[in-house]
């Protein structure tokens, strides 16, 4: 884990954001719109691997509709994290799902209640 200099508890915050990211990628979470929606910030937006910009409204339902609840899980490689400010973590990693690889970046924000929510996500398909 990497961190911004001088941030107390950086490793803990990065670990918590990573756990939330892994949850958001699990088949169980992706197949359950209510569960996924709890992880999305109300001002969530994404630049998907398709190049489309996606907002909060309807995202969880769309993901659930496209998720096979007994399907292949998303494989994650080389996840790294940076604490950008107290309660704000950026994650970078590579994913593979159904033969398709993508470089991914997520920005997570801790709420006043201590829960982590994803504010921004971008996926870029890689060649190979």
Where are these regions (language model features)?
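Juxtamembrane and targeting peptides
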Residues: 1-8
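A solvent-exposed, acidic/Ser-Thr-rich amphipathic alpha-helical stretch
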Residues: 14-15, 27-87
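Residue-level marker for the onset of beta-strands and adjacent loop->beta junctions
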Residues: 77-78, 91, 104
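Hydrophobic residues embedded in beta-strands of well-ordered beta-sheets
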Residues: 88-89, 116
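Short beta-strand segments that buttress and anchor functional surface loops
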Residues: 91-97
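Short beta-strand edge/turn micro-motifs at domain boundaries
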Residues: 101-128
């Amino acid at each position: 884990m990497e961190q911004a200099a001088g941030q107390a508890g950086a490793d803990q915050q990065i670990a918590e954001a990573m756990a939330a990211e892994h949850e958001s990628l699990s088949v169980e979470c992706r197949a359950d719109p209510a569960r996924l929606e709890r992880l999305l910030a109300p001002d969530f937006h994404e630049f998907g691997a398709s190049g489309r910009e996606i907002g909060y409204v309807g995202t969880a339902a769309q993901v659930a509709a496209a998720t096979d609840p007994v399907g292949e899980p998303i494989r994650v490689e080389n996840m790294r994290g940076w604490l950008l400010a107290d309660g704000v973590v950026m994650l970078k990693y590579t994913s593979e799902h159904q033969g398709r690889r993508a470089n991914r970046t997520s920005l997570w924000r801790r709420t006043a209640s201590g829960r982590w929510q994803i504010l921004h996500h971008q996926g870029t398909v890689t060649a190979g």
